Design a protein with these regions (language model features):
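Short amphipathic alpha-helical surface micro-motifs
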Residues: 16-20, 31-39, 67-72, 82-88, ...
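Long, charged/polar, surface-exposed segments that mediate recognition or autoinhibition
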Residues: 55-77
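Short, well-structured beta-strand
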Residues: 49-51, 74-83, 87-157
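Extracytoplasmic/periplasmic, Sec-exported soluble proteins
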Residues: 46, 63-67, 135, 139
Length: 157
């Protein structure tokens, strides 16, 4: 999920993506649904490895969780544990016809800065997070602008 810090092995980078890794949340409460990178996490590069990570965690794992903004306690905790600092406290953000909650983080990686924006929505008993990582604000915004929601309909049988 993160730009490759030449001192950190790729296994640790993958564990950062999935809080279900060792020392994190058990596999029963959090799942990474999608992790997409500009290049494979094992491949070192000069620039930040842009990424999109979609994860879902059962709301039942967080008693009292009533809105997406409250989920930023765990989100911020995970980001800070990975060396990020909060740049923008959680705020409402409109994506198409849906309002989500967004928080922004940054981390120095050698001579580069890694930016992370995480958007959260509560849906069907899950806290669903969309995390976008890039090396510039423009790169992150371009990734965020690619997110859209469509109205759910009845399943076709």
């Amino acid at each position: 999920m993160n730009a490759q810090d030449n001192t950190a092995p790729a296994k640790e980078d993958r564990a950062a993506l999935d809080r279900t890794g060792e020392g994190g949340c058990p596999h029963t409460c959090s799942k990474v649904l999608l992790a997409a990178f500009s290049r494979p996490p094992e491949v070192r590069g000069e620039d930040v490895n842009a990424a999109i990570v979609i994860a879902a965690e059962s709301v039942a794992e967080h008693p009292g969780l009533k809105d997406a903004a409250q989920y930023f306690g765990p989100v911020s905790g995970a980001a800070v544990a990975q060396g990020f600092e909060v740049v923008e406290e959680p705020y409402e953000f409109v994506v198409g016809t849906r309002t989500v909650v967004r928080g922004d983080f940054q981390k120095d990686v050698g001579s580069r800065v890694m930016l992370q924006s995480t958007l959260v929505v509560l849906a069907r008993g899950y806290a669903v997070s969309f995390t976008f990582i890039g090396g510039t604000a423009d790169e992150v915004e371009e990734l965020v602008q690619g997110l859209s929601f469509v109205a759910g309909g009845k399943a076709v049988k």
